[in-house]
């Protein structure tokens, strides 16, 4: 893999590209010196690109986290302090946690997972890691609940992340966000909607991470909105 990257870097007609599982962490290890501090804390990349067309080396980023938070930009950028509950610390969860860091002085960020990360990750991200078993006792405090696990996806359709009785503990004003896009309505979102909560699915994140990757790779001056329209959606 490292030899391949060295060859591609020398070929200036190769602008970059997308990085998929299982190479996100492996490529990060090779290109970590060319990432910003946020990406180093995440420890995984999904996009390589040249910051300048004549650069001899690839830069790298992770558009999963940036794409996931874009639909929440107006809420997160508001003046009201919020409690944000993020469930899952896999590839997408790490990316979202890394980009949520920019809001840690304004909002309380709680990361729920079945297993707790080592102290190094916890200290670097400066986020409160909590055992998933404690979610039922904490859920009533949460303003934005984000599912970054695969529970509820096509491969796990019959699995339930949170029992409906626990969703009833959420505030009436709470927002439930599931980054899964297939199906477009997971059991978590269906239950939340029936309770009367606002919900967001993963369709926009899926588009935005690709739009952002295209923008990086092609070094374009087109705006995010212009690229969204070109790539199939302005919603």
Predicted regions and their residues:
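Phosphate/diphosphate ligand-binding glycine-rich loop within oxidoreductases
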Residues: 1-76, 191
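Short glycine-rich anion-binding loops that position phosphate/pyrophosphate groups of nucleotides
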Residues: 20-26, 92, 150-153, 182
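Glycine-rich adenosine-cofactor-binding loop
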Residues: 62-65, 72, 76, 80-101, ...
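Short, conserved loop/helix-junction motifs that constitute active-site signature segments
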Residues: 77-80, 101-104, 164-173
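Rossmann-like adenosine-cofactor binding region
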Residues: 125-199
């Amino acid at each position: 893999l490292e030899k391949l990257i060295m060859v591609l870097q020398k070929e200036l007609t190769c602008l970059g590209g997308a990085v998929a599982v299982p190479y996100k962490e492996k490529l990060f290890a090779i290109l970590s010196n060319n990432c910003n501090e946020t990406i180093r804390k995440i420890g995984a990349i999904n996009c390589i690109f040249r910051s300048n067309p004549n650069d001899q080396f690839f830069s790298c980023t992770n558009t999963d986290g940036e794409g996931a938070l874009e639909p929440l930009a107006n809420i997160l950028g508001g003046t009201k302090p919020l409690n944000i509950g993020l469930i899952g610390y896999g590839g997408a969860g790490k990316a979202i946690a890394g980009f949520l860091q920019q809001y840690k002085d304004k909002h309380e960020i709680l990361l729920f997972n079945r297993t707790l990360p080592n102290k190094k990750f916890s200290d670097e991200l400066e986020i409160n890691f909590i055992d998933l078993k404690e979610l039922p006792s904490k859920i009533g405090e949460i303003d934005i609940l984000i599912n970054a696990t695969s529970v509820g996806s096509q491969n796990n359709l019959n699995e339930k992340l949170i029992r409906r009785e626990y969703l009833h503990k959420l505030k009436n004003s709470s927002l439930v966000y599931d980054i899964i896009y297939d199906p477009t309505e997971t059991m978590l979102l269906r239950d939340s909607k029936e309770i009367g909560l606002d919900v967001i699915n993963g369709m926009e994140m899926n588009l935005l991470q690709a739009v952002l990757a295209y923008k990086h790779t092609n070094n374009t001056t087109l705006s995010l909105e212009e690229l969204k329209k070109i790539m199939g959606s302005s919603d």
